[in-house]
Amino acid sequence: MSRVGKSPIALQGAEVKLADGAITVKGPLGTITQAINPLVNVANNDGTLNLAPVDESREANALSGTMRAIIANAVHGVTKGFERKLTLVGVGYRAQAQGDKLNLSLGFSHPVVHQMPEGVKAETPTQTEIVIKGINKQQVGQVAAEVRGYRPPEPYKGKGVRYSDEVVILKETKKK
């Protein structure tokens, strides 16, 4: 059995409802509904969730670990939330959050306006910092990757949009 799939999930104050092939996790920050693969059994035992494969097949074993990680992320998301921090490096690079839009000036001839999907918010504590928050880990990471994709850090000066924990390795310039 999968090592990840064996460990139980502590609910940390989240409510869980199991109904017809789906699990609904409700917490103080919101609600997430996730489909459960039929190869995985889910049992709710007084504040913890236990997952087990239906049979001993390799696919069921792998899916039990995957489903456990997805459900654990849902529990974490509705109780504490997820956030991803981005930093803008470069002269004149600015960011400003306005409602559900993120306005970026990244050295192009036009400003870049990124529309935030439902359930994801962007904050700009300073003009060169962006904090993307939400309850869905996959969605927060996807939005952060899309914003970074407008101007990824270039390898010679390091200018661009980078994750705050990202280390950009700079290349040496060509010598004559």
Curated annotation (Swiss-Prot):
InterPro entries registered for this protein in UniProt = Ribosomal_uL6-like, Ribosomal_uL6-like_a/b-dom_sf, Ribosomal_uL6_a/b-dom, Ribosomal_uL6_bac-type, Ribosomal_uL6_CS
Q: Which PROSITE patterns does the record match to this protein?
A: RIBOSOMAL_L6_1
SUPFAM superfamilies according to UniProt? Ribosomal protein L6
Q: What does the record give under GO molecular function?
A: rRNA binding; structural constituent of ribosome
Q: Which domain of life is it from?
A: Bacteria
Single Gene Ontology BP annotation? cytoplasmic translation
Q: Which GO terms describe its cellular component?
A: cytosolic large ribosomal subunit
Keywords of this entry: Ribonucleoprotein, Ribosomal protein, RNA-binding, rRNA-binding
Which family does the record assign?
Belongs to the universal ribosomal protein uL6 family.
What is its quaternary makeup?
Answer: Part of the 50S ribosomal subunit.
* Function comment: This protein binds to the 23S rRNA, and is important in its secondary structure. It is located near the subunit interface in the base of the L7/L12 stalk, and near the tRNA binding site of the peptidyltransferase center.
Q: Which PANTHER family match?
A: 60S/50S RIBOSOMAL PROTEIN L6/L9, LARGE RIBOSOMAL SUBUNIT PROTEIN UL6M
Listed name of the protein: Large ribosomal subunit protein uL6
Q: Which organism's genome codes for this protein?
A: Burkholderia lata (strain ATCC 17760 / DSM 23089 / LMG 22485 / NCIMB 9086 / R18194 / 383)
